[in-house]
């Protein structure tokens, strides 16, 4: 399968807890004043680490002692996502992890614990592909995530944040005082993903690429017959200096996005991240091919259990309106409580064209394929 890394700057905001000039450093070691949190199946041990200062070591545990299949809804339940600021989201990190009917992680527990590493078992980050899940760790001070394996989308979201991911043997080495070359954390990835991770995540990488501080690896595929999708990608390759590029299954490339869209559950973060990374004067190229929709939370304030979040939901709507006014993208806001339509359907009908490369924040974005677009 062709591996595509999208060239966007909308996934994460970067701020550093560690006193280093650049993250990640060339050599990775544990900070003397930070801690390691083990998410054990014995939840009382988790409580003792959070509230009683208990420190554990991987040498004294096995992978089987650790929680498997940690769901993103455990990390950031849907109600947590009504906040758009990752620093606020982090205050309710792991709010969905319950024991005997009450939260294991009280508000600010992960932030106040002084942790820089978090450790779990197999398949970390299953479930919904929400970016807020790794954000809740990142903005709690976590910079290294240890697991036996990761759910693919969650792994990509961590990578976009510049979070280093490793295994339990690497953690043993770190806890025994070893400094590990960052290449051991990044070496298993394709060349483009390595660049993103070694430059601190998607936002700083994109900024350095734009400023000419990062060179993309050459597209190495020789001239060959290509499928329709491969031709779409080859026509939009970055870093080929005007030359014709050929791609094949397994290549990792950067391709220029033609258009996209967002909805009120996610646009607030887009506006916040772009403003902080590029300044308040940032612009969106070709705004007629981008759009915002009010459809996901249209009826949320009429649902009794969401009533207490009404103010936060309105903030999400207001920030989407601010983004639209700032960028001039297409506006599909509701009028008198009536939405123009569902985002992935309206986008396909009105502005996705044949041959477009579309990126959007809705899980049904791939509907654009019905218009012979790569979405």
Model regions and ranges:
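Fe-S-dependent hydro-lyases/dehydratases of central metabolism
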Residues: 1-375
């Amino acid at each position: 399968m062709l591996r595509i890394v999208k060239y966007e700057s909308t996934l994460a905001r970067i701020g550093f807890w560690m006193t280093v000039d650049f993250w990640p450093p060339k050599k990775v070691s544990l900070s003397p004043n930070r801690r390691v949190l083990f998410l054990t199946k014995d939840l009382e041990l988790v409580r003792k680490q959070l509230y009683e200062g208990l420190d554990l070591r991987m040498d004294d545990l096995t992978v089987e002692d650790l929680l498997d299949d940690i769901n993103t809804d455990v990390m950031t339940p849907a109600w947590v996502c009504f906040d758009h600021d990752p620093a606020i989201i982090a205050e309710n990190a792991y709010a969905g992890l319950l024991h005997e009917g009450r939260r294991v992680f009280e508000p600010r527990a992960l932030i106040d614990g002084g942790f820089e590493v978090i450790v779990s078992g197999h398949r970390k980050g299953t479930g919904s592909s929400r970016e807020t899940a790794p954000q809740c760790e990142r903005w709690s001070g976590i910079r290294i995530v240890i697991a036996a394996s990761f759910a693919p989308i969650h792994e990509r979201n961590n990578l976009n944040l510049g979070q280093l991911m490793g295994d339990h043997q690497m953690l043993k080495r770190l806890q025994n005082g070893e400094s590990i070359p960052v290449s051991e954390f990044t070496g298993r990835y394709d060349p483009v993903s390595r660049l993103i991770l070694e430059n601190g995540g998607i936002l700083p990488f994109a900024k350095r690429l734009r400023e000419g501080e990062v060179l993309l690896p050459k597209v190495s595929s020789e001239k060959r017959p290509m499928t329709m999708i491969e031709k779409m990608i080859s026509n939009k390759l970055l870093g080929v200096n005007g030359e014709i590029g050929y791609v094949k299954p397994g290549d990792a490339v950067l391709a220029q996005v033609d258009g996209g869209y967002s909805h009120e559950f996610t646009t607030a973060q887009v506006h916040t991240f772009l403003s902080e990374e590029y300044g308040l004067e940032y612009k969106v190229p070709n705004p007629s091919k981008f759009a915002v929709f009010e459809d996901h939370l249209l009826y949320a304030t009429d649902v009794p259990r969401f009533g207490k979040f009404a103010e936060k939901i309105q903030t999400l709507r207001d920030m989407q309106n601010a983004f639209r006014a700032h960028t001039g993208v297409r506006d599909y806001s509701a009028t008198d409580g009536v939405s123009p339509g569902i985002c992935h359907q309206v986008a396909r009908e009105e502005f996705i064209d044949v041959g477009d490369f579309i990126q959007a924040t809705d899980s049904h974005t791939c509907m654009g394929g019905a218009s012979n677009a790569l979405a």
